């Protein structure tokens, strides 16, 4: 007996923009299908989708494990349009969100300890196989289907466009600070890099009651850091005198840079037993000097986006403290130009695609 066809297995006709193969790096209209809404699933009409550096790296084929055609986008805000019979988390018509993760094994140490984001078999939002073996497609599309365990309730008081980047950049910085104890009022934290991730790290740090110093190689970012985002200080990392004067002044550093850069001068800024939170993911290895760590009892902590429970906590915290990303809302047709600008760092501070109003179905859907 023949097995079900792909169209029978995935009856929901969908459309979006995809990179068709590993060589082009160019996004274009794409037709595909989503699975039917299962008993524990939520069908979601996508309103907005944020664009992050992971999306850029993915379309540039920097991750060999991804499958193509690839529909990127892992910062999704939408509306629940259908729910399975066993869904209790959300109702039809409510605003919902999805972050980077769509599934996990549910059995390993990480999963049973609510650390499913670190599960060895974690299913990320696109380019990887789902439980049934079919490939996941991301948020640059008109709709999606997700298990309720990974669906988030999106607070009504948050802007859906400004809130979309919270699903990646926001939770990454929030989770790192919460899990490492860098969320206590009065602590002094340095934020390295003032991009999409860095500017949200500043906002959450200030909401926690921390003293914040932005560390950057770009002098022009001082005004935005202090007057725009409320940072308490600005440190130009290329200025040897400024760096020398700041030695031993920070309780923690949040490093958000996604490019290779020297770590040793930053470690010197930490007090004894200070914490260096590494959030950026450069494509090449960083040089790690052992002496500053050993002599000061300092530690380096890596952190990826948080688990589902913590991501919901982050969204609720953001709503309470009026935290959203500074965004440039774009139509889907602008996506390739936006990726080029993102590659050059030419955005303050996040691109968000208006899916609802600009994504139209390709012909012959």
Swiss-Prot record:
Changing residue 168 to C: Conserved ability to reduce precondylocarpine, but increased accumulation of over reduced vincadifformine product. One of its GO terms (cellular component) is cytosol. Its EC number is 1.3.1.128. Keywords: Alkaloid metabolism, Cytoplasm, Glycoprotein, Metal-binding, NADP, Oxidoreductase, Zinc. Changing residue 54 to F: Abolished activity. Its cofactor is Zn(2+). Disruption phenotype: Strong accumulation of precondylocarpine acetate. Zn(2+) binds at residues 105, 108, 111, 119. Pathway: Alkaloid biosynthesis. Glycans are attached at residues 142, 147. InterPro entries: ADH-like_C (IPR013149), ADH-like_N (IPR013154), CAD-like (IPR047109), GroES-like_sf (IPR011032), NAD(P)-bd_dom_sf (IPR036291), PKS_ER (IPR020843). It catalyses: dihydroprecondylocarpine acetate + NADP(+) = precondylocarpine acetate + NADPH + H(+). It is found in: Cytoplasm, Cytosol. One of its GO terms (biological process) is alkaloid biosynthetic process. SUPFAM superfamilies: GroES-like, NAD(P)-binding Rossmann-fold domains. The keyword Amino-acid biosynthesis does not apply. Homodimer. Interaction with catharanthine synthase (CS) and tabersonine synthase (TS). PANTHER family: ALDEHYDE REDUCTASE. This is Dehydroprecondylocarpine acetate synthase. The gene is DPAS.
């Amino acid at each position: 007996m023949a097995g079900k066809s792909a169209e029978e297995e995935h009856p929901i006709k969908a459309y979006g923009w995809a990179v068709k193969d590993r060589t082009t790096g160019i996004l274009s209209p794409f037709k595909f299908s989503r699975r039917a809404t299962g008993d524990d699933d939520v069908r979601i009409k996508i309103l907005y989708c944020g664009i992050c550096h992971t999306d850029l790296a993915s379309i540039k084929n920097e991750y060999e494990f991804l499958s193509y055609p690839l529909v990127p986008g892992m910062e999704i805000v939408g509306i629940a349009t259908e729910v399975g019979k066993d869904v209790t988390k959300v109702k039809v018509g409510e605003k919902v969100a999805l972050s980077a993760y769509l599934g996990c094994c549910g059995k390993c140490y990480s999963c049973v300890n609510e650390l499913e984001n670190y599960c060895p078999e974690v299913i990320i939002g696109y380019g990887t196989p789902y439980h049934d073996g079919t490939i996941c497609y991301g948020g640059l599309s008109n709709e999606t289907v997700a298990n309720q365990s990974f669906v988030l309730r999106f607070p009504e008081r948050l802007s859906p466009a400004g809130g979309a980047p919270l699903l990646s950049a926001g939770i990454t910085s929030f989770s790192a600070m919460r899990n490492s104890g860098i969320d206590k009022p009065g602590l002094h934290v340095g934020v390295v890099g003032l991009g999409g991730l860095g500017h949200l790290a500043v906002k959450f740090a200030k909401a926690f009651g921390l003293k914040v110093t932005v560390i950057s190689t770009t002098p022009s970012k001082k005004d935005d850091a202090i007057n725009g985002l409320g940072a308490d200080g600005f440190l130009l990392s290329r200025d040897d005198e400024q760096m020398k004067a700041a030695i031993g002044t920070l309780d923690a550093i949040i490093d958000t840079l996604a490019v290779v850069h020297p770590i040793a001068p930053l470690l010197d800024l930490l007090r004894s037993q200070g914490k260096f939170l590494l959030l950026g993911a450069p494509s090449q290895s960083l040089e790690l000097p052992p002496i500053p760590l050993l002599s000061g009892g300092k530690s380096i902590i890596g952190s990826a986006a948080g688990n589902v429970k913590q991501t919901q906590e982050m969204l609720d915290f953001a709503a309470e403290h009026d935290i959203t990303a500074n965004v440039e809302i774009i139509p889907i047709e602008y996506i390739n130009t936006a990726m080029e600008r993102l590659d050059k760092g030419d955005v303050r501070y996040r691109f968000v695609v208006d899916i609802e109003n600009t994504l139209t179905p390709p012909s012959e859907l």
